């Protein structure tokens, strides 16, 4: 009998650390959670992407965690940490079994491994006061947040483009030296009331660009501003200024951040967020104008209009071309720090207008999107074999159909 007691006591001692671990509260205040997520996304893409919009989204949900028992598909898609199958399984589990009683219950849902659960823990909860946010002026003043961010970057080693050069050498190779100073300056101001209202201004000067001098007397080389409001009756979203559009899988139209490759094949499928306010510094991947979404369940209707200037290479038209100048290619670097890049700046206008209608019935979404694009000058790609299927002309009409379940 004494041996049995010793055995039971020994088993209790061994099991104690496991039991204690299981009772530890969930640490949802991991200070590195946002940085870890950005690093994970960066590891799965080869492109140089500005992650400020993703960072802002994660920081918002870290401060205002999603109540999983009261959430919907759109909010979970906005978080960007779960794929379509995981979102479906979570919503079906709650619909079938009722509200979650513990975050550890996520382990019983198909598709939620420990890595996924740990990645979303800082941004979710299952309890708390969930009184609906209202459009009250006093509440907007008391609960809103203003953020001013300034970043200065400089490379200590002298770069070749800033080294002294003789006038004769510069005349022979005018693009061998940068026109401006050797630092990068980025500043952003944003006012936000939860995720319902935001407006802000972003400005950036790249390495080698002039600042309040020469060709940049207006100061920064790039300015961006937006006003965004949502959830006012049937008006689901309204964006004025700079914004991005994300629909379907991006074959018809998609602007802004998009996750590319992934180690998991299941993560290839995208989750479009519709109309998204733009506050990043990429000088190409956005719309400039206005966009609106109206919802009358089960239908949602989107409409948008945009006009902005694009950088492009310009060449004189030949004798067979009715236009005096043609565009041979569009420039996407956003840099304006040499003679040639200054010449290419804002050479062509882009006008875009379009609409989308989608229907969501339970977990089935069906949508159709169409938009018209007109450029200020004709685009005439070169005659190389790899350019054979490149766009040519100055007008384009895109129409697409997408579905998801």
Regions found by a protein language model. Give the residues of each.
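Bacterial N-terminal signal peptides that target proteins for export
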Residues: 1-8
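Short, solvent-exposed coil/turn linker segments
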Residues: 3, 65-67, 99-102
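Bacterial N-terminal signal peptides
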Residues: 8-17
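Sec/Tat signal peptide C-region and signal peptidase I cleavage site
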Residues: 18-22
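Long, highly charged, low-complexity intrinsically disordered interaction regions
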Residues: 23-81, 85-92, 127-133
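Outer-membrane beta-barrel channel domains
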Residues: 78, 85, 91-92, 96-99, ...
